[in-house]
Amino acid sequence: MNKTEKALLQLTGRALFGTPADFEPSAVDWSALYHEASNQALSLLIWDTLSDEERGSVPDDVGIRWEQDSFRHIMNNEQLLYEQEQVIQLLTAASIPCVILKGSSSAANYPQPSLRIMGDIDLLVRPEQQMEAVKALQANGYGDVLDEKHHCHMTLHKDEIAVEVHKEPNGLFLDGNSEILGRIRNYFSDAIDRRQFMDGLPVPSDEHQAIILILHKLEHFTTSGLGLRQLCDWAVFVEKKDG
């Protein structure tokens, strides 16, 4: 592990849990740290936790890009949260209950939820209502399904916003006849009935959320690789539930 990675981990720990960071700001390659934080989808979280001394050590050109990038993420988060609320209201009116997967569901466990960068909107509905939910969205401005044959979700776009309508969580890459897959699907059969609300947001029960996070990590581990943000999602979930 190099100095940049160590500094990034220490800053992440401070942002999430208040643990002290032990490094000399002037010795950090801030350009490399910014790029790595961006690659890990943590640039907003890290920029917010920097002290005045640390920001003063960031080269001007890097600091300008980082600050602009952070502002862009804040605006994108707000836009997604607004659209998410509209989608939830739309599905509720159509008698299609749902829960939020990942995204703001995971962000709710962060000390400052607004600092978790969002990418899209992931909704879990009952399998038998997946197409009904898709049609409800299409009747309200969303386009054609891009991945109709995907094993667990259908993705629709409206302008630059993507909504994934799931019939089951990510990470279930097992053979359709697998006994394990059958057990996992059976485990999630009551996910909608057992949903809870956090600040009005429908989210999975703690037990379901734990398995969803693990399955999501499994998917990343076996495909694109496990990132720091996935570890952060798990760490803050465990910290909040243990606390």
Where are these regions (language model features)?
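Conserved NTP-donor binding/palm subdomain of two-metal-ion nucleotidyltransferases/polymerases, i.e.
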Residues: 1-119, 125-243
